[in-house]
Amino acid sequence: MPEPLDLWIGKDEVEGVPSQPRQDVKPPPHWRLEAVVATERPRSLTVAADGRTAAFVQDRDTSDVWLLELGAGAPSRLTTGRDPAPYWEDTEPRISPGGALVAYADQGSVWVVAAAGGPPRKLAEAGSPVWLGDDRLVVSVERDDTSRLAVLDVADPWPRPLCGSKPQATGVPGEPGIERYGDESEAAVSPDGTAVAFAFTPRHDLLRTEIRVADVASGAVRTLTGTPGLADKGPAWSPDGATIAFSSERSGWYELHLVGADGTGERQLTQAGADFTAAEWHRGGGRLVAVRCRRNRFDLVTVDAATGEVTVVAEGGSWSSPHWTEDGAVVATYEDAATPSQIRLVRPGERPETLHAPTPLAVRSAPHVRPEDVTFTSFDGLEIPAFLFRPAGASPARRVPAVVYPHGGPTSYYGDEWDGHAQYFLDKGYAWLAVNFRGSTGYGRDYERRNHGDWGVGDTKDCLAAAAYLRTLDWVDGRRLGIFGASYGSYLALLAVTDDPEHRFRCAVAKYGDCDILTSWAQGDREGVQDMGRMMAHPSRDPTAYTAGSPVHRLGNVQVPLLIAHGELDLRVSPKQSEELVQELRRIGGKAFEYVTYPTEAHGFLRGGLELHFYRRLERFLDWYLM
């Protein structure tokens, strides 16, 4: 792994003084950060219409597109130099129905490249391409401060709106009786290519997402589903074009539902008390493949389209992006706590076959710790789920320090997935507690909405309850606890040391997070602002909630050192948030903190050298204060 160039690192300070290396930091016996950072991640898998070829993204220093002939050897790299993209926001590459072209998004534009190889061609400023025949694409474009779907001719790439009438800027129902001011996403083209199903979120109700269908020729739109304050997502056409499957949270879980393409006959298909995603119909039409979430373990399942019966094809771990192959098998990506991301082929009754696993031997040979599912009680009696990793050798006679890790989002989760950075620190002797605080997904709608209107209050107390739980374990040294998070997890880490009169944590790490959610609301990109509005409403409606959720007002309470890190190109959480935090710490005085910025990085440290630099800084910081 090459060392990061100095010009890739902006500020690197300890209380305003240039940071200096430590000579006494030693790696653990079995793991190296270089190997963790070098572990490539195949993801965002799609399969061609004939079921023979897969396209996927593989993260390294870039997020390039690769092709894999199913059952025919090693994959081939199709693009070079595609910008690194965070997996949680990137879109899938798509193979044209005839197999000649691959479409993908990069640098704010849609591109196509010959599947046989060659230079890519930029079509238009757009994203999320989906093929409409072999010569057109449905893409997402930004118009009137909304995300709209458009049709793009590959030969003459000028986008025209998919939906015929202009959105209504008032946010009230428009012609012809259909709300038009909102965001269109998740395009799914009908088998005959005459219609596109999509998800629509109106601006006046950000909790609502409905399924709509647009006629490609006329632009006429009809609404198939929708309930105030609830979401329907992920439309998928049946092979005969008569039925659309989708996930809906109406029951309290994202169960699978079916509706006729004409809007009739809607019914709930599954009754599993679980979330289902990524549904795709079998070519025969009688069943679907999907991913079922089971307390943030993600099983690969099939669902009978008539009865709703769920059959487990392969348990998680974490399965994602499942697709049918030509011969009725399923290809999907898989990972778990001991297995980095790989592409697998699954046939009923057989062990999954690994098709592509770009894991370094240094990682394959290293010992992995699998987590234990635990729960603990928070301040109000709510049971909080978490994954607890116990390092080898931890015992009452050899008590270890521990790190509490709240995930980002907040509408997200920590699942049974590969976390090489956690494994590295486990090998050093740290315990690791990954907390799915209130507001996390995977535990039902009521749990997910527990933090609405309450950012930084109840969920912070969940993190404090995590520290209290760790103190009950006789193999954890309760005096040596740290908290580390990224994005929303960074925000909670900061709150955990501003709003805790017991001062449970000895140090905290804030990686590209908020310190003032009111100014962050003003600074953020459209998606971030809408996400905040969905959960916290407009600041003018409840300014006290924004104040209560902003740790910058209470930094005088901080009694422990902070490590603060931010990318200077971050649009989701502006780097001004960390600047504001540092300025206020300096104004108060007497606070210990370290501050590092990265000029080339956005929301996520994606380039290998800079990721390595940050985790070395993290190691140095945690070792100094906890080891």
Predicted features and spans:
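Extracellular/periplasmic ectodomains of large secreted or surface enzymes and adhesion receptors
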Residues: 20-33, 165-168, 176, 326, ...
